[in-house]
Design a protein with these regions (language model features):
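Mid-to-C-terminal alpha-helical segments outside catalytic/metal-binding sites
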Residues: 3, 105-150
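Short hydrophobic/aromatic-enriched beta-strand-loop microsegments
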Residues: 34-38, 57-62, 146-147
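Ser/Thr-centric signal marking residues that sit
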Residues: 61, 65, 88, 130-131
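Active-site phosphate/pyrophosphate- and oxyanion-stabilizing loops and adjacent acidic/basic residues
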Residues: 73-74, 113
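Non-cysteine beta-strand/loop elements that form the S-adenosyl-L-methionine
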Residues: 82-90
Length: 150
């Protein structure tokens, strides 16, 4: 984490089943100053809000689309869209309707659709904002947005 801060690079955190403990460490290290994202978030609403309040992003994968994960969709609905990211965990965790098949990066569109449904927003709005969030998070040139999916 010290290297992350020194290089001013955003931190990607994989903290499966340890989201709250990881958040405590991230807060103690002021990780929000440079930026961090909780990859493949599966924690609680309280932890997700803590991530946002600490300056981090919450990222969802194909598991958001699974029937059993209504609570995870409620968490996505409760968070500000400006703090959400979408991703896959390819080649694993393919979203519905591709569940059981090899996950591909383009399946992240299904994650965006699930967020749009959960938040009662248009798919295009979710896709545009999560693309902007990603560009800003990684410090990419804004020209990247002109090639973003429409």
């Amino acid at each position: 984490m010290k290297l992350h801060a020194a290089l001013k690079n955003p931190l990607i955190v994989h903290a499966r089943d340890a989201e709250a403990a990881a958040l405590d460490i991230l807060k103690s290290e002021d990780a929000g100053e440079v930026g961090f994202v909780m990859h493949c978030f599966c924690g609680t609403l309280e932890t997700a809000r803590g991530v946002v309040n600490a300056g981090g992003h919450v990222s969802f994968t194909g598991n958001l689309t699974f029937k059993k994960n209504a609570e995870l969709r409620a968490i996505a609905a409760a968070l500000p869209l400006e703090r959400l990211m979408i991703e896959t965990d390819a080649p694993y965790m393919a979203p519905v309707p591709y569940r059981g098949k090899r996950c591909e990066p383009w399946h992240s569109m299904e994650v965006a659709r699930a967020i749009a449904l959960a938040k009662h927003l248009e798919f295009d709005e979710v896709l545009a904002q999560t693309c902007c969030n990603t560009v800003k998070f990684f410090g990419l040139p804004e020209a990247v947005l002109s090639s973003a999916p429409q």
